[in-house]
C-alpha cells in the first residue's frame, strides 16, 4: 500500500503539483494538511478526477485536512469532531481490512507559549491522545499531522 502525506499549504496553489503527484505516484491513500479552502465540494470533485473518494474538513484561508483513497479501499470514518477547535481540523478513518486507523490532523498553533492559544493546544492534544487510547487495541494507529512544534 502506498500512502502519501503532504502539508500542501493551499490546495488551489498546488493543484498542478498535486495532479502530477497523484498521476506519477498513484497513492492508495493521500492525506493532506493545510488545504486553505472552504468549499468541500471543490476538494471532493478535484479528487474524483483521479477516482479517489475523499473526506475533508475545510476552513477558509487556513487549516483544513483531507483523506483521499482509491475507490476499492473499504474505509469507515470515525467522528472525532469534539477535537475541532478554530485552528484545528482532523479526519479519522478505519481501514477494517488492514486493522489500521489513520488520523490526519492539523494541530492548532500554540504560539506564543505564555498564551491562551498554547493552553488550548495542550488541551486539544490531551483530548486527541485520550481519543487514540479509546480506540480498539487490535488496531494499529497512524497519526499524520502538521504539529507546529
Label the predicted regions:
Residues 128-144:
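His/acidic metal-ligating clusters that form di-metal
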Residues 26, 98, 137-141:
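Short coil/turn segments at beta-strand junctions that form active-site/ligand-binding loops
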Residues 147-149:
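Conserved small/polar residues in nucleotide/adenosyl-binding loops
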Residues 17-20, 123, 127, 131:
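Alpha-helical elements of Rossmann-like donor-binding domains used by nucleotide-donor carbohydrate transfer enzymes
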Residues 81-83, 107-128:
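Surface-exposed cleft-lining segments at the edges of enzyme active sites
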Residues 31-32, 102-104, 140-145:
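A structural signal for short, well-ordered beta-strand segments and their strand-loop junctions
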Residues 1-46, 52, 62-65:
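N-terminal, active-site-proximal structural segment of metallo-dependent hydrolase catalytic domains
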Residues 35-110:
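Structured beta-strand-rich core segments of catalytic domains in phosphoester-bond hydrolases
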Amino acid at each position: 500500500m502506498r500512502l502519501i502525506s503532504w502539508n500542501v499549504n493551499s490546495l488551489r496553489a498546488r493543484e498542478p503539483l498535486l495532479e502530477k503527484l497523484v498521476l506519477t505516484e498513484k497513492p492508495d491513500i493521500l492525506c493532506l494538511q493545510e488545504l486553505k479552502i472552504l468549499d468541500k465540494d471543490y476538494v471532493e470533485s478535484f479528487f474524483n478526477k483521479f477516482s479517489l473518494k475523499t473526506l475533508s474538513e475545510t476552513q477558509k484561508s487556513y487549516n483544513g485536512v483531507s483523506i483521499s483513497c482509491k475507490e476499492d479501499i473499504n474505509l469507515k470514518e470515525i467522528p472525532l469532531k469534539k477535537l475541532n477547535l478554530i485552528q484545528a481540523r482532523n479526519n479519522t478513518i478505519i481501514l477494517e481490512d488492514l486493522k489500521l486507523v489513520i488520523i490526519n490532523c492539523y494541530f492548532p498553533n500554540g504560539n506564543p507559549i505564555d498564551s491562551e492559544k498554547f493552553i488550548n493546544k495542550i488541551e486539544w492534544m490531551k483530548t486527541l491522545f485520550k481519543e487514540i487510547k479509546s480506540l480498539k487495541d487490535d488496531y494499529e494507529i497512524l497519526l499524520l499531522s502538521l504539529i507546529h512544534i
